[in-house]
Amino acid sequence: MGVCVERTRAHHGDQPAGRTETNDFEPGDIWYFPRGHAHVLECLGNEPTHFILIFDNGYFSEFGTFSITDWIGHAPKSLLAKNFGLPESAFDGFPKQEVYFARGAIPPEQIPENLQGPRIAPSQTHKFRMLSEAPHGVFKGGREWRVDSTRFPISTTVTGVILDLEPGALRELHWHPNADEWQYVIEGDVSVTMFGSHGRFRTELLHTGDAGYIPQGYGHSIENVGSKSSRILIGFNSGIYQSIDLSSWVAGNPVDVLATNFNKPESLIRVFPRKDVFIAPSK
C-alpha cells in the first residue's frame, strides 16, 4: 500500500488478465498493488513527490523486486528480438542493469493512453481517496480515517489508517487480534505504550518521522504529548480491520465479575464508561 503525501502518478502495468490502470494521486490518496503485479510511480510537476509505502511482510524489501530495465538488460538480444518481433539492433544501447530512478521530461497533465490493454474494472481500482472521505470516526480528542477491503476491495492484505490526535488526547488502550500494527508519525510527538503477557510493559516517545511496531495481540495506546495536533499513519498486515478496546472489554463484563476481579465495590465499577471510548480527550 502507498500513501501519497505529495502529488504523484501511479500506473498499474498489468494484471494477470492484461488489464491496466493509470491514476493521479493527491495528498491523502492511497494505492494498493497486489503482490507480484507490475507498476510504476512518476513525479508530477516541478516539485518532488513524497509517498510512504507499507508492505504486509516485515521481511520484504523494496529492493527485492525487479524492474523492466533489469530484465530486458540481462536477456539476450536474440531472445528479445524473437519475443517482440523486432530486429536485434532495436535493443542496442538499452541499459545493462536496473534503472531504479529514471529522470525524464515532466509527464503531461492529461493521463496518456497505453500502448494497448483493457482498463481495470472500477470495482478493482487501485486508488482510494481516503482523506477526501469523511472520517470513519470523529471524537472530542481527534478523528480517524480507515480503509480496509470492505471499502477498498483490492486491498486484501493491508488496512490503512490515518489518526489525528489533539494535544493531550489518547487513542485508548486496545489490541488487534488479527494483525500486527506499524506506525509512522507524519507530524507531532506521541507516547506509545505496549503491554504483553507476564507483566511486560514499555513506553516509547515517537516524533515526526519515527516509526513504531506493535506485534499482533499486544495491548497498546497512543497519546499526543506535544503542544500541537499529531497525525499518525498506521498500517495493518490484514485486509480486515479488527480492534478490541479496553473500555469496550470492561463495559462488556457483568458488574459483579469486575468487582470480584478487582476486589472493588460495585459502586465504583458502575461509574466506568458503558460504551467504547476509542479516543479520550485531554483532561
Predicted region positions:
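Short, surface-exposed secondary-structure edge patches
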Residues: M1, T22-N23, I162, W182, ...
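Short loop/beta submotifs within extracellular cysteine-rich repeat domains
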Residues: R9-H12, G18-R19, V40, P48, ...
